């Protein structure tokens, strides 16, 4: 019976590792391609040719052309840079901000903890995308403002995770010994607290990449993100939605790109969570 349990555990571990390798490779390939997208496009993504406007997919233009005769494949490839880079930047910002607030609350405690946690409660009580729409509406359109708007409402989750982990570490015997040794607060946080709480925070960040990508695309679709003619998947869908019935390939192309990218990052996040779960190592 023990051998059977061990065998099942081994199969589970190997399966999780295989998934981790597969989705890591796919995610890295997606990120690398987005950064070198200008070298991968078969045509200039900004080049207009009204003679072939709204052309259906052909051998020369596998994804067809848009209303201005621009090659859709080139637009989708070029749009990966703005879509993926802005998503990674957003997740990095909210992870850093939320972790900083959470560690501060957990370590300092008292009034600081109470005030910052009540502020986070306010943000958590309001539907995220609705609040982001309001912030983006005040700041105005643009990809930078969309990132600021989503960052403003997305950090509380990370703050709560970092705070709970910091409180747990703060009460351990070895941490009390470190504090009694006379080490400075900054050194303790950087050397002892952050390395021990970063795991759950990073897992949450990986799971959030797909969500943030969709929310950025949603803001762009509503006209509050990237502005034409900059190729960005959400704004490309918004710019072509009136052609959905007559030239559906123009709208479907960036939509499929969003779907595939979100699926890859979501599956990678799920796999990292499974890999970090102690049960998967039994």
Where do the protein language model's features map onto the residues?
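Generic hydrophobic transmembrane alpha-helix motif, especially the helices
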Residues: 62, 66, 97-98, 106-168, ...
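Transmembrane alpha-helix signature in integral membrane proteins
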Residues: 72-107
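N-terminal signal-anchor/first transmembrane alpha helix
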Residues: 1-43, 119, 197
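Glycine-rich helix-loop "coupling/hinge" segments at transmembrane-helix boundaries
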Residues: 136-138, 150, 165-166, 214-257
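Loop-to-helix entry region at the N-terminal start of transmembrane alpha-helices
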Residues: 74-87, 137-157, 249-255
